[in-house]
């Protein structure tokens, strides 16, 4: 898990947070998607075998519950902070929205592949236990 910060330019007319795809996103993006949700909506609850994902909050606050072979923590994201987080493959992630009308953008280093998903938590734990050895 790696965090990235973005420069924030605030004026009375609004806030600008520029993002350079080739510089600020830590890989060449092959897929981008948006997730919309309201308070206490939960998404995710899975891991990827090969896909890395970069999560960037667009509007509102959200929390990622992240489990990998080194971490088991909750990561708070806020669109006003100009920060995103990179999750590598074999990272279990549960996304919880904490404010109304929250939006998060997710950049992926791979196209969608059905077989890349690990949706059973016990299977995931067994896989990362084997990787620790």
What is each of the regions a protein language model found here?
Residues 1-85, 100-108, 112-123, 127-133:
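Non-catalytic, conserved peripheral segments adjacent to functional cores
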Residues 94-95:
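Cyclic-nucleotide recognition modules
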């Amino acid at each position: 898990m790696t965090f990235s910060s973005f420069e924030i330019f605030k004026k009375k007319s609004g806030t600008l947070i520029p993002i350079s795809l080739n510089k600020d996103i830590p890989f060449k993006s092959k897929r981008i998607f948006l997730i919309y949700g309201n308070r206490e909506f939960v998404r995710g609850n899975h891991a990827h075998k090969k896909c890395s994902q970069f999560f960037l909050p667009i509007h509102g606050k959200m929390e990622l519950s992240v489990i990998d072979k080194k971490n088991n923590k909750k990561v708070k994201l806020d669109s006003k902070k100009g920060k995103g987080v990179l999750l590598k493959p074999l990272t279990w992630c549960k996304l919880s929205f904490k404010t109304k009308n929250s939006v998060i953008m997710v950049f992926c280093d791979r196209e969608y592949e059905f077989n890349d998903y690990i949706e059973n938590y016990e299977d995931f734990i067994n896989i990362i236990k084997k990787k620790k050895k």
